[in-house]
Amino acid sequence: MKKLLAGSILLAVLLSVISCNTKKTDGFTIDGTITGADSGWVLLKKREEGKMITADSVQVKEGKFSLTGKVDMPEVYYLKLANVDGAFPFFIENGTLTMKVYADSIDKSTVTGSVSQDALVAYQKDEAVYNHKMEALYGDYTKAKESRDSVAVKIVETAYDSVQNAQSKFTKEYILKNGKSVVSAYLAISNAYAYSLEDLKAINKSMDPSIANSAYVKKLAERETILSKVEPGQPAPEFTLNDTIGKPISLSSLKGKVVLVDFWASWCGPCRAENPNVVAAFKKFNSKGFTVFGVSLDTDKAKWQDAIAKDGLTWTHVSDLIGWDNAAAKQYGVMSIPANFLLDKDGKIIGSSLRGEDLIKKLEEVLGK
């Protein structure tokens, strides 16, 4: 009886210990120290639907703070100090994390205890080689522009593009080789704007089932689905937005013409630089049945209308004036502008990302010279 009682007590103690340990590792604890701020507030933020929200906050006491919570999968959060510019992005995963935060240079902050964060830091260290090269080349580019040396400008631009392409290749190879890491999924969705449908298919195929529940993996799958609906050969998704006087205009109302669905904004420098090329194409081919359907990602109606007038954009323009939340942009998977899609007279997509001479050549192919 005594042995049975002793065994029961021992079992109860062991279960208690296991229970306590489970509670400690069930979620995450962030223990942080701040250099340069003994008081104030720490804000833990995360990105949801393109917007930054505050997930938690805690008061700093004697330069220290502690945050607790739980995540289903490792995920990037942003640590921000109230009334201090900038934020520090880092991977949170369940367990105990230790942070060293520097109030005067928050981007130099560090985190230990997160395997995913360690992997991200290692990647960033290797990627920095390319960033340093591009920074140096940008300095050379600025000097060449100031001295009006067009030959030097061209040489530097070519060199910069070469390094940028090498960086993109490095990142893509990292993603494809590390499919078991949520970091790869995070990097992939962060660079998704630059990936074709074929790229995304390969990346999604490389993702390990063990990280299938990651929000980043799910977003990659959604991205692939969207792009598959707007690739050449597909019927252009229908949408209706208001024009500059508030009248609803549907894309389908232009059926029977070759249409360039052109995503742009008044605040977008590259868009404004490309507008003269679109104007030239419109003037050359409008009489042959070509038109443009301008979709603006503006939020300010006056600035939108002013840009239309200044750039001489004499075609139909629509917008919902909610910036990147633009319904049509989301429908077409637009993550950067300028972006465009060329439709034939039946409303079928026959090209995309056509700029400058490429647009002219494609229109000559479709409508003749």
Regions found by a protein language model. Name each.
Residues 1-32, 368-369:
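Bacterial Sec-dependent N-terminal signal peptides
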Residues 85-87, 97-99, 103, 153, ...:
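N-terminal targeting signals for export/organelle localization
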Residues 190, 311-313, 320-368:
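Thiol/disulfide oxidoreductase modules built on the thioredoxin-like
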